């Protein structure tokens, strides 16, 4: 379901970029490291009407992907923002084409596009969910649980999230912290919706270990192999009963189509930052829906900006599995928006206000800003 009614163009006058350091409520450990502070870039599109906000979901180091904060900061200020400002007036649907000559840097492109889109929709008085074609007013909320010190600690953490009302549990795994951790959670909580996420920690040589996870009746195993291992993922998928879901490998509509053609995955995790923007994310949703492939919305520890946009995206009809659109309090004691996402009966509401549907808390934003720069025409 392509965007039915494109947004109006806006006259861009500048961009303000900020690097934020947001303390996490607890350390978040994956197969590639531990975060205690979320470093992220937020973008403010300055226009002749309402300003718009976006989020560049890079981290401090190039561990999840090749993108990282300082590289994103440089390419945004030196190349991508100036290219958009040179156009003067443009519609959100034109942002991707303007930025296409610049290779890669999808997270930066996504953040800039979202800021322009937010500004345009605020000017029109339209909500982002309406623009996307959302069919739900709230979305089921899953939670991502990092690697804990031992299986017992993991069970304690999962139990706390289930008590809060999360409807699906995802646990991070890595070699040596996979089968026993998964067994502990399954034994403790029975037939809860459960999936695991490897963040590319394995190779095809680990197929026997990964096959041991089949006995736990998981919803899926997410990104077991490296980002560029589409062929090996297809080989592994034939070996496992557990559905293989791709995350890091899906960087565009074409990558999604290639993965489906090869049989590399039977489920797709869609992250707007990873694929270059929310419009590309909608296109991947449409591709998968037409192919009968389930999708769900992944998370990148977003602030209230990206979390609101993710909720709107996850309200599309093809998102049939609970995603990582959790409450803001899962990661942050204090968010940078005035009305952070909250968990209500296992769901997060889709904002209905203009644009993103959330307003920035200027004091909270200033308190976590470590660098700020503005570029104008």
Where are these regions (language model features)?
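N-terminal capping/lid subdomain adjacent to the active-site entrance of alpha/beta enzymes
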Residues: 2-194, 201-204, 208, 212-215, ...
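Long, low-complexity, intrinsically disordered polar/charged segments
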Residues: 133-142, 186, 211-221, 256-274
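Catalytic beta/alpha-barrel core
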Residues: 167-175, 193-200, 217-227, 243-252, ...
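Shared catalytic-loop signature of beta/alpha-barrel
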Residues: 228-245, 250-347, 351
């Amino acid at each position: 379901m392509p965007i039915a009614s494109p947004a109006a163009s806006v006259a861009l006058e500048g961009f303000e970029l900020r690097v934020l350091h947001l303390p996490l409520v607890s350390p978040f450990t994956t197969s590639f490291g531990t975060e205690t502070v979320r470093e992220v870039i937020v973008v403010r599109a300055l226009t002749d009407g309402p300003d718009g906000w976006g989020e560049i979901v890079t981290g401090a180091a190039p561990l999840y992907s090749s993108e990282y904060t300082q590289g994103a900061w440089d390419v945004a200020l030196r190349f991508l923002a100036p290219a958009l400002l040179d156009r003067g007036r443009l519609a959100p649907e034109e942002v991707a084409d303007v930025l296409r000559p610049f290779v890669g840097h999808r997270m930066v492109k996504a953040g800039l596009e979202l800021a322009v889109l937010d500004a345009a929709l605020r000017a029109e008085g339209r909500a982002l969910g309406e623009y996307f074609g959302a069919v739900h007013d709230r979305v089921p909320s899953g939670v991502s649980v990092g690697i804990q010190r031992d299986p017992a600690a993991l069970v304690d953490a999962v139990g706390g999230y289930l008590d809060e009302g999360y409807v699906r549990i995802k646990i991070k795994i890595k070699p040596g912290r996979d089968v026993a951790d998964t067994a502990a959670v399954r034994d403790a909580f029975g037939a809860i919706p459960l999936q695991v996420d490897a963040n590319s920690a394995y190779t095809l040589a680990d197929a026997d270990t990964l096959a041991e996870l089949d006995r736990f009746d998981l919803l899926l195993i997410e990104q077991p192999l490296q980002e560029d291992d589409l062929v090996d993922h297809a080989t592994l998928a034939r070996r496992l009963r557990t559905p293989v879901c791709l995350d890091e490998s899906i960087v565009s509509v074409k990558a999604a189509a290639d993965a489906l053609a090869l049989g590399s995955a039977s489920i797709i995790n869609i992250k707007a930052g990873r694929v270059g923007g929310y419009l590309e994310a909608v296109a991947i949703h449409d591709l998968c829906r037409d192919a009968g492939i389930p999708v769900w919305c992944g998370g990148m520890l977003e602030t209230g900006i990206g979390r609101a946009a993710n909720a709107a995206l996850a309200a599309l009809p093809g998102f049939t599995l609970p995603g990582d659109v959790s409450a803001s309090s899962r990661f942050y004691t204090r968010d940078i928006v005035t009305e952070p996402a909250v968990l209500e009966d296992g769901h997060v509401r889709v904002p209905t206000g203009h644009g993103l549907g959330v307003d920035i808390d200027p004091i909270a934003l200033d308190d976590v800003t470590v660098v700020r720069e503005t570029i104008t025409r």
